[in-house]
UniProtKB/Swiss-Prot annotation:
NDH-1 can be composed of about 15 different subunits; different subcomplexes with different compositions have been identified which probably have different functions. This is NAD(P)H-quinone oxidoreductase subunit M. NDH-1 shuttles electrons from an unknown electron donor, via FMN and iron-sulfur (Fe-S) centers, to quinones in the respiratory and/or the photosynthetic chain. The immediate electron acceptor for the enzyme in this species is believed to be plastoquinone. Couples the redox reaction to proton translocation, and thus conserves the redox energy in a proton gradient. Cyanobacterial NDH-1 also plays a role in inorganic carbon-concentration. It is found in: Cellular thylakoid membrane. The gene is ndhM.
Length: 119
C-alpha cells in the first residue's frame, strides 16, 4: 500500500495516475481536491489550493516521505480550504450528493444581521 493522506476534502497520494489508476511513486505526489464535490469551485480558488500545496511540499522537501508528513500537509490544506469557505471564495454545492456542512453551517446575510458577525 502506498503512502497517503486523506481528509474530508483533500487526498494526497505518493503515486502517479496511469490509465486512470494510481501507481505508487517515490518522487511524485497526486492531489485530489474535494473528491465528493461538496463545494463550488472557480479556477482561481483551485489554483490557490494548488499553489499552497506546492508551498507545503517545498517546505517539507528533504523530509521522509511518510504518512505522518503527508498528513501534516493534508491537514494544512484542509484548514486552507476552510479559510477559502469562510472568506467566501468557495461555497457549498447545494446539489452535492450529501449536504453535511462539514465545515460549518453556511452564513446567510439578512437585513437584520448584515455586518453584525464580521470577524
Amino acid at each position: 500500500m502506498f503512502v497517503k493522506s486523506t481528509t474530508r476534502h483533500i487526498r494526497i497520494y505518493a503515486a502517479e495516475v496511469h490509465n486512470s489508476e494510481l501507481v505508487e511513486s517515490d518522487n511524485m505526489l497526486t492531489l485530489d481536491v474535494d473528491p465528493d464535490n461538496e463545494f463550488n469551485w472557480d479556477e482561481d480558488a483551485l489554483q490557490k489550493v494548488y499553489r499552497k500545496f506546492d508551498e507545503l511540499v517545498e517546505a517539507a522537501s528533504g523530509e521522509e516521505l511518510s504518512d505522518y508528513n503527508l498528513r501534516r500537509i493534508g491537514s494544512d490544506l484542509e484548514h486552507f480550504v476552510r479559510n477559502l469557505l469562510q472568506n467566501g471564495e468557495i461555497s457549498y454545492n447545494l446539489k452535492s450528493r450529501v449536504l453535511n456542512y462539514s465545515m460549518g453551517l453556511p452564513k446567510v446575510e439578512s437585513p437584520e444581521t448584515e455586518g453584525a458577525y464580521n470577524l
